[in-house]
Structure formats: structure tokens, C-alpha cells
Curated annotation (Swiss-Prot):
Name of the protein: Prostaglandin G/H synthase 2
Signal peptide: 1-16
Enzyme class: oxidoreductase
Cofactor note: Binds 1 heme b (iron(II)-protoporphyrin IX) group per subunit.
Gene symbol of the encoding locus: PTGS2
Disulphide bond pairs: 20-31, 21-144, 25-41, 43-53, 554-560
Catalytic residues (positions): 192, 370
PTM field: S-nitrosylation by NOS2 (iNOS) activates enzyme activity. S-nitrosylation may take place on different Cys residues in addition to Cys-525. Acetylated at Ser-564 by SPHK1. During neuroinflammation, acetylation by SPHK1 promotes neuronal secretion of specialized preresolving mediators (SPMs), especially 15-R-lipoxin A4, which results in an increase of phagocytic microglia.
Pathway: Lipid metabolism; prostaglandin biosynthesis
Bilayer topology annotation: Peripheral membrane protein
Key words, A-Z: Acetylation, Dioxygenase, Disulfide bond, Endoplasmic reticulum, Fatty acid biosynthesis, Fatty acid metabolism, Glycoprotein, Heme, Iron, Lipid biosynthesis, Lipid metabolism, Membrane, Metal-binding, Microsome, Nucleus, Oxidoreductase, Peroxidase, Prostaglandin biosynthesis, Prostaglandin metabolism, S-nitrosylation, Signal
Gene Ontology BP terms: cyclooxygenase pathway; prostaglandin biosynthetic process; regulation of blood pressure; regulation of neuroinflammatory response; response to oxidative stress
Subcellular location: Microsome membrane; Endoplasmic reticulum membrane; Nucleus inner membrane; Nucleus outer membrane
Binding site for substrate: 105, 340
Amino acid sequence: MLARALLLCAAVVCGAANPCCSHPCQNRGVCMSVGFDQYKCDCTRTGFYGENCTTPEFLTRIKLLLKPTPDTVHYILTHFKGVWNIVNKISFLRNMIMRYVLTSRSHLIESPPTYNVHYSYKSWEAFSNLSYYTRALPPVPDDCPTPMGVKGRKELPDSKEVVKKVLLRRKFIPDPQGTNLMFAFFAQHFTHQFFKTDIERGPAFTKGKNHGVDLSHVYGESLERQHNRRLFKDGKMKYQMINGEMYPPTVKDTQVEMIYPPHIPEHLKFAVGQEVFGLVPGLMMYATIWLREHNRVCDVLKQEHPEWGDEQLFQTSRLILIGETIKIVIEDYVQHLSGYHFKLKFDPELLFNQQFQYQNRIAAEFNTLYHWHPLLPDVFQIDGQEYNYQQFIYNNSVLLEHGVTQFVESFTRQIAGRVAGRRNLPAAVEKVSKASLDQSREMKYQSFNEYRKRFLLKPYESFEELTGEKEMAAELEALYGDIDAMELYPALLVEKPAPDAIFGETMVEAGAPFSLKGLMGNPICSPEYWKPSTFGGEVGFKIINTASIQSLICSNVKGCPFTSFSVQDAHLTKTVTINASSSHSGLDDINPTVLLKERSTEL
């Protein structure tokens, strides 16, 4: 009763019209207003009871006593390499642990989805309208006294000031995990099949109606775009040959809309599935590789099934590429990010006897969380030369000049930046970062600590606990005043990282559930789909089950250059700068009106 009285008192003192502004319901309890000044917490199936869902049930109490902290789990999984080498060789142990990883993470994501920016309560509209991003937490009610409910100041600090003071890079900080640019561009390329904000309607809306791994960034979101890029022969996509190698066709040859500045020559306006991928040659590199892979798989299937027509070859190849993508993401991409000695495994059969829903809805917070711009370097090093942002942006001639092989070799060697911790946001994306912060405010995100609680983490009690140091903590204290008013986006980038890790705790604990649910919730992972016949027989099934980032490169890049998602040598080779400005290139250097036309905050 005392806690309830204090929360209501705080709301009244602050002039709150909505008693749920104080976020009184804990442990995923649902707050429902009762009249104008009372609330009721629905604790159903939370494992807790009481007025604010704070008293654990008996079984919950036992689970809490036995459950190790995220820090402990991370330590165990990143140490004792000899033990994990043994575990990885014992199939039933590896399967048991992987099943637990998948279920424990994915069960943190509501399925079916619950809220969106306009519905802080469950509704048919929030469930059925696929044009919205869903929400992990409902938006802060409109009639609250502060932007975060009842905590913090009545106005948030100026977003430009936040970016400049606590996010903007002073000096490049390399990632201690050795993450490279092959990873950075893979992340950017992969996520743009489901992060497709509809800027014309607002940041809470998406054009990616499939809400998952559909490879629309390879094939196109609409049927018209897909058809314009297809050959309609042997299942293949249109292409052109340059210097004996396959590249995407041009905009002129496909009549596909792409975003390019007007001064770009027609022969350099490549047409791919995602209209924004002309922005960076690193994205066009991956677009080229996946184009080659699709057409290669079509050849394999054509040989296996000469009786099949164009449509079946195309559709089956697409399913195979979706499977390859999911396997690469889990076993190479997520494996690298985790730093675990335990080997992650893509095996849909692990979930066949579990309660699991094969559907997914992309959350706005997942989009915000994935703003990993600190990965970007100050310059791009390719074949002994350096390109600054002004030289790199919208410049497909760089890809043609050096070739895909040299791009792969160079990006594999170049280290990316550390995402969490100290200021490491490149100046070139300052405006993009500011837009991300502005849009999260427009969508009325709850505080960083509320998101920590949502993902079963202990809220931070001070800015110093958040950052792990005093100087940054003092800056944040001056900007926000209250740790419970700290915003999600900047907090993710200033949170103290785990030792020798790229991310802080919250990025991992919140990001992993979104990622794994989205990957394993794909229809191809369901019992009805996951069988050889779906993929053209054992030949197609084998392509998926043997996929890796290295095999993708070897099958489609001349010379089969070595690649991985981490640098093998932390000492970077010296390079020559060509026509490079001594200052960092900002967005003003690259025609921001074009860049900001669509989805700038996601690039």
C-alpha cells in the first residue's frame, strides 16, 4: 500500500492526469487506469502478485534464486574454452544448450504483438495493422507531466547537444573483439530487409510488411519491383557482365526506382532490391554477391530439376537463400558478436517440440537498438588506398575499379569501431544520429531503465553505474538530471561494455530476443516447411545446411578470398590517401537532401 501511495502521490504532485504515468506495474504487469486517479496492475501469468506485481510466487522465487546474472552467464560462455570444446562435440549437450538459448530469448518477445505508437493498450488494430512497427513497451501516455512519465525534467535536452556532448567521436576507438567492415556492411545490408521506415507517414510506420527475413532487399519489396529485376528465364535475376564478372543491371535497363543524386552517370546507377543501397559501395558489394548467389543456385536447381519452369526455380532459390541467410546470421554473425566459446547452431528441429509461434513483428525499439553507426571508420581502406566519406558515398565506380575480390579482402582486414562505451559516433552520421533521437522522442519511448526491466535486467541507480566512469556520467547528469529519465538510444551507446566486448549488457540482453525470434520465427523454420522437398530436394537442403560467410564468398567471388567477421591481425597496414580532405566528411558534403529523402536514420 505504501508503494502505491507514493506512486500516486508522485503523479498527483507532478500534475499527472494518468495514474499509469509512473509505470507502477513491475515484472511485465499491465497497468490499467481506473477512473482518473487510480490504477490496477494485471499480474496474470507474470509469476508475481500484489498491487504492483512485486511479490514473487513460490516457483518464481525458486527460479530467481537459481538463475545466474547475465554477467555470470557471459563470463561462463566466454571462458573455459577447453570445456566448451568438449561440449561442442557432444551433440545432445550442444542441442540442449542451444534449445535453451533459443527458447529463453525468444519467449521474451510477445507473440502475437501487443502495442504500437498509437495504441498503448491491446487492440485489434495494433495486432492486425502491419504498416506499424510493434512496440516492446507501450508509449508513455500523452498526459504525463514529463516525457518519461513522472521522472526527469519537463523537457528533454536538445538532441543536437546530446549527440555532440556524449556520442560524437573524438578519436576512433577500434572494437576490441576485432569486428571488421565485412561485418559492418553485412549488418547494414541484412537489416534493411525489415528496417524500412515509412518516413512520409512517420517513424512508427514501416514499408516492410513481411516483418522479417524475406530477402526483399535482394528481390524487392513489391511484386512490380521484383518483376522488373527478373529475367523470367531459368529463375534468374537480371544482371550485366563487367570485366568478366556479374554485377547488378542498371536503373535504365530495369526501370527500377533507386535513390541516386542526379549527377551520378547512368552506367553507375545499379538497380537492386533495396532502393537505398546505392548509397555505399559496401552495400552494393553484398547486393552483388547475393545476386550472384541467387543465379548460381538457379543453375544448381535447373540441373537437378530440368522439368521445372522459371517460376518454381525462382521461388525455390529464394527460399534457399533465406535459409542460407539465417544460417550465416546465427552461426557466423551472432556467433562473432557473442564472443562465446559455445558454438551456436542453426537447427529448426530443436524447436519442433516446443511452444513456438512461426510469426514475427519488427519492433520500433529493435530498429533503434540496431543503430550501430560507431562501427563505421573514419576512412575506408581498399587495396592500399583510403577513401573518405565524400569519396565513398554514392560511388559505385570504386567497386568496379577495385572489384569484389579486393573489397572482400580489404574489408576483412579493416577493423570496425566499438559500439558501446566512450564517444565513437563518426561525424559523417551526426545528423542521422540526431534524427534517430528525435524520432524515438516522437514515438514516446519509455526510459532506458524501463527497457532494462522489460528485459529482466536490474535498473541502473546512477549515471556512473551506467557508464562505468565519472566524466561521461557528469555530462549525462547535467543533461538529464535523473537516471530514470535517461533515453534508450544514447544510453545504449554510452553504456559500459563488457570487458573486451563491442556492446554493453543492455544491447545484448534486449537485442538477442528480437534477433532470435525474428530468425527462428521465419516460416521456413516451421515443421511444415523445414524438409528437403521445400528446397528442391537434398541438393538445395545441403546448400542451406553447409552455408557460411566463407562458402558464400567462395561460391561467388573470384579467387575465393579468405573472409570472416573479425580481423585476423589487429595491426592495420599503412595506406595512401587519395585526394582526401584533412577534415571528416559530414552529411553536408554528400547532398543531405538526397540522403535524408528516405530512411536516413537506418543507414
